[in-house]
């Protein structure tokens, strides 16, 4: 029943370009008993629409966050982060902030993957190998994006005031902050 309703909503959204699909909580255990591969709305919608260009984003009055990766085990996050992935996610986020939120020149803060955003390669290499090169390319294309920020200080009062959205590398890096501020 739940998947049938979600399928119907997806089809209606695809056929009417002026609509949006807003999802809410659902009982994943019930769905997984029917579809063992179900991990969440984002992945399911991506599968149904056969789209590579998807972004999981949550927004409240206080904060907008998006995810580079979605519902994957933490052990798989580092190997999933690539320059191409970061570029794709930031471009989608930047475009959606302009079109859906009417923000002329979005300010996007990107979190690093590792503690202290890797400390210039001392704590992991993902920032140096993938994240920073992606952000430099995006800046050359005039996208207003930060260099990788340490997650433990990214959500300072100043950053919250001057940022239109944050891109986190994984699910539980940014969602707890959004939920603490907004629920």
Regions found by a protein language model. Give the residues of each.
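Anion-binding alpha/beta catalytic cores of soluble intermediary-metabolism enzymes, centered on
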Residues: 1-183
